[in-house]
């Protein structure tokens, strides 16, 4: 029985719009059960084929050339049946997974509504409040609960999208074959805390259906060899219908926790706290830890009694249509949609969630997209919409201002430095290219980045607070996504977006919690004065990725984060940006759209300077250099003592020009123009460093020179590889 929609005087306001999952979890459980029955029939046929193969060909009844050919053909059919078993296991576990997600979301939302309703009852009976105060308090509570429910629906939609490339758990096939019939779902009836809920365990009566084949089944196995009756002798197998009750025991945490939330009405201000039934998203039991989950789970005696009866048409019934099994993407083929077609996942997200929009399919040049994915994963899917997609979308709608981010020579704020040591700094050296800044999979970005270091708008802070308790049940995943959303909002703040044509940031988070960012300008470009938090990676400055791969993604930040994840063998969970920035791209994963009130007034973040991000060894060397030895890091001063003419405004305008084009190959023109700007900025920084009289100003100029030296060298290598 599916979880019903909460009722109450304020329930509708807490649920509409977009605060309730309209999908029916029982539909998915029923489909999983139907496919489980198909799996049992396929397994019966498979066991019969194996038995007959061993009896005829291995028992010596038939030998010779014709026998070998027939043996090979039958072996091929057996392999096909095993493959079909794997497909069915994928479909069954996916349907149960989606049903569990829907169940969990509904029960969490029910908890929120019930807790808020109890708090409202307290407020309505509070004699210390006047009518206006009571009305205001109730409205704020209803609004906060509605926001939490909408966020839960959005989070569920994201997790449904993540299941596009669903892979069944280990030993899933063995577990399914041991059940004989799928276990009834454990439905957490948190919404209506009535004592009638224990009646749900009565559903295991359905396992009685496997008992019906047992009387007729032993009759047919007697026909083969005397050893065959051993299979019918497993009348102990009827006990296996009891095993659906045992899978219920791993799921006991789900019904147990529903009882506690209604009893404990404490802290209803954060109605998401009772959300503890986390085991529900994975309803499939895993009691049998068999070691090998591959496509050879040979369980000869599983459905023995009913198997040998009719190997051709099991049960005499029309064979169910099992085409949906092929729709589940195979684990080894994640990138079949890279040619520009639409990618069909097993389900669609709830489009009522305002903050998550399903990834739209868009035309992508197949060759270019495939070239951007060095490891063969689905990196290019829709990442670059060829000619018609204005990749200068997002911030690209701003009018060209012709203003370059010019750094003045009287900067007073020095970058964060460690205490200078007394040693003599070595002479200037070329930028290091051997530094490999690989993502640390052992800890995600949220483990090392305090949220207080990221600016956040009041509206976003309120939403995060409302959903904090609900996300606590999956601590790492929720925190990483919440942190990534805040970073994306800060990068889109007005003080981080100077209105340069086509310049915008994209933020992505992986399934293991890593956060990577990319922008549409140059390579390793970070605007002056901007800092990135620790454990946040810049895709175009990754030393491990070949420079030609990085260059292919220039001006296309969505493609850049996809290529970064593919190179490091990671899976993207979501891509975050504004609606305009994500409109013409298909990242192949969930899109999280930033709302206008998500973006803070200031995007100033505390973390690493741009030199520390792109060249950590040079930043460390600069920090260890005393003020008296700063010039040792630079080449000799130019012979001409006159300052070079500052042409950065015009050069910046030139690098913006390619961003107005949607033609293929605009990235090469942009990189050439950006290289000219970087070289000129390096020349100006060198002159400023040699002529500065203040140590703080000189240190800033040296940092600028080291940064632009690195960027110039990177662009030189990229352009050389492209030519």
Curated annotation (Swiss-Prot):
Positions with biased composition (Low complexity)? 200-209, 230-249, 309-319, 393-404, 412-426
Q: Which organism is it from?
A: Mycobacterium tuberculosis (strain CDC 1551 / Oshkosh)
Cite the PANTHER family for this sequence. BONE MARROW PROTEOGLYCAN (PTHR10068), CELL WALL ADHESIN EAP1 (PTHR10068:SF14)
Which ranges are annotated Pro residues under compositional bias? 210-229, 250-265, 274-308
Q: What does this protein do?
A: May act as a chaperone that facilitates EspB secretion through an interaction with EccCb1.
- Would you tell me the Gene Ontology cellular component terms? cytoplasm
Task: Supply the name of the protein.
Answer: ESX-1 secretion-associated protein EspK
Which ranges are annotated Basic and acidic residues under compositional bias? 432-444
Instruction: Tell me the lineage of the source organism.
Output: Bacteria, Bacillati, Actinomycetota, Actinomycetes, Mycobacteriales
Q: Could you tell me which residues belong to the region Disordered?
A: 175-360, 393-451
Domain of life of the native organism: Bacteria
Coiled-coil region(s): none
Keywords per UniProt:
Cytoplasm
State the compartments where it is located: Cytoplasm
